[in-house]
A protein has these predicted regions:
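PLP-dependent class I/II
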Residues: 1-158
Length: 158
């Protein structure tokens, strides 16, 4: 019940949602297309890095987070997903949210990994100038994400 309540109370109220609709009535197509392009590139990068390192994860189809599952890789090392998150943060400085915060069994090592730690304005301005973005662009415009994913993988494989 607590998980459901937190999701209900942390949502925007109806008046705020209506205000957002009015704010977005102008043509936001260019902004949305480039935002999607950036988030698709980052999501694909995170997915590939985790998947090629034997970490179970579904390919993102939108949004700005993925839910990696470390259960097969590290299940015998941690009592709960919350314990895993604490140790990961202490040892690497990388923060994940435990799956138990989203209704998953606390013993399952499932997490929410958000990939939005980058300067969106700079990345968008660069994206407006490019037809295509590349993995190399992530090193320039999303270096914390690249570094964070690498830290997670190195830590999990030690």
């Amino acid at each position: 019940m607590q998980v459901l309540a937190s999701e209900a109370y942390s949502s925007a109220s109806a008046p705020i949602q209506y205000a957002a609709i009015a704010a977005y009535e102008s043509d936001q197509t260019k902004f949305l297309n480039h935002s999607k392009k950036i988030l698709n590139l980052i999501g694909e990068h995170c997915y590939k890095k985790l998947k090629t390192n034997n970490i179970e994860v579904l390919k993102p189809e939108g949004g700005f987070y993925i839910m990696p599952d470390f259960s097969t890789l590290l299940s015998n090392k941690f009592k709960s997903s919350a314990d895993f998150c604490k140790v990961l943060l202490d040892e690497t400085g990388v923060a994940l949210l435990p799956g138990s915060d989203f209704g998953f069994d606390s013993k399952k090592l499932i997490f929410r990994l958000s990939f939005v730690d980058f300067d969106g304005e700079k990345f968008l301005n660069y994206s407006y100038l490019k037809d295509e973005l590349s993995e190399e662009d992530l090193n320039i415009y999303a270096p914390k994400i690249v570094k964070g994913i690498n830290k997670i993988i190195d830590w999990a494989n030690k």
